């Protein structure tokens, strides 16, 4: 499988109105033991910002240091993917709400990356819903249990970032996916 663990942070919920603030991607070479990551913060001259989005992702608008234009981030993301996938491969985005949220922004705002990715996506919420059914558990209870376990594991990686950072959340998605996959196999 051509998995790609993906997360973005945005200035709001509407991909036609709001902007991608940062993107994190993770390619797993050997589970959590060996993975490669990509992270960029995006520089914008103008932004439409939904206050609730900033409350969640705690984005700092006071500095543009280390931020790149969206076009440069789009190009760099494709260069990153070319290191790990053959030209004929279309990596499958995996994450929480990745198809219904993240990919809507990527399809509109990062056309080079969008063209490189599969048009399909795997939403980890759907897989957890299936696991909840398998174990006769409440979905929200199972999601909290697995999320807490994944956060505890990812927090130990000393990434230098925390929850609601696109890189942290991409690694979190990988960890959560591996736990779900292991449960399905057992």
Label each region the model flagged.
Residues 122-137:
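Short alpha-helix plus adjacent loop in nuclease-associated cores
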Residues 47-56, 139-151:
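Short, flexible, mixed-charge acidic loops at enzyme active sites
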Residues 15-17, 32, 105, 131, ...:
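Short, function-defining helix-loop hinge/capping sites that tune catalysis or transport
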Residues 101-120:
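Substrate-recognition/cap helix-loop segment adjacent to the acidic, metal-dependent catalytic center
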Residues 7-9, 102, 123, 169:
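Acidic active-site catalytic centers that drive phospho-/nucleotidyl reactions
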Residues 93-96, 104-109, 141-186:
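Acidic, Mg2+-coordinating catalytic module of metal-dependent nucleases/exonucleases
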Residues 114-118, 137-142, 185-186:
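Short conserved catalytic/interaction loops centered on acidic-Pro-aromatic/His motifs
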Residues 2-4, 9-100, 155-158:
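Conserved non-catalytic scaffold segment of RNase H-like nuclease domains
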């Amino acid at each position: 499988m051509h998995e790609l663990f993906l997360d973005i942070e945005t200035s709001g919920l509407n991909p036609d109105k709001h902007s991608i603030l940062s993107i994190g991607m993770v390619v797993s070479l050997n589970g959590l033991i060996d993975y490669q990551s990509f992270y960029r913060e995006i520089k914008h001259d103008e932004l439409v910002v939904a206050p609730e989005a900033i409350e969640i992702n705690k984005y700092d608008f006071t500095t543009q240091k280390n931020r790149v234009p969206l076009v440069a981030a789009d190009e760099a993301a494709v260069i990153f993917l070319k290191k790990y996938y053959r030209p004929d491969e279309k990596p499958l985005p995996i994450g929480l709400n990745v198809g219904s949220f993240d990919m809507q922004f990527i399809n509109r705002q990062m056309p080079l990356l969008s063209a490189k990715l599969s048009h399909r996506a795997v939403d980890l919420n759907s897989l957890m819903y299936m696991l909840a059914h398998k174990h006769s558990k409440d979905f929200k209870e199972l999601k909290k249990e697995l999320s807490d376990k994944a956060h505890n594991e990812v927090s130990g990686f000393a990434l230098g970032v925390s929850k609601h950072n696109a890189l942290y959340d991409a690694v979190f998605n990988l960890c959560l996916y591996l736990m779900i996959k292991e449960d399905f196999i057992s």
